[in-house]
Swiss-Prot record:
It comes from Rattus norvegicus. Pfam families: Cortexin (PF11057). Residues 1-20 are annotated as: Disordered. This is Cortexin-1. The gene is Ctxn1. The chain crosses the membrane at residues 30-50.
Amino acid sequence: MSAPWTLSPEPLPPSTGPPVGAGLDVEQRTVFAFVLCLLVVLVLLMVRCVRILLDPYSRMPASSWTDHKEALERGQFDYALV
């Protein structure tokens, strides 16, 4: 005798989604590769910014400190406000 609350075994309906072994199509692979490249560039920029923040003066050449000093002391500028 079967209990009224149990269900009789019925076959499951066929799945309407993509097959389990289906891979990505060409457009999805292209977008995935593009996003991956953007993430790599973002990580490289973040590493560079952190390195500059930790030691800002090591990346700056010493000549840039003295090139424009004489012109500024004389009151000459590269541009003039009219």
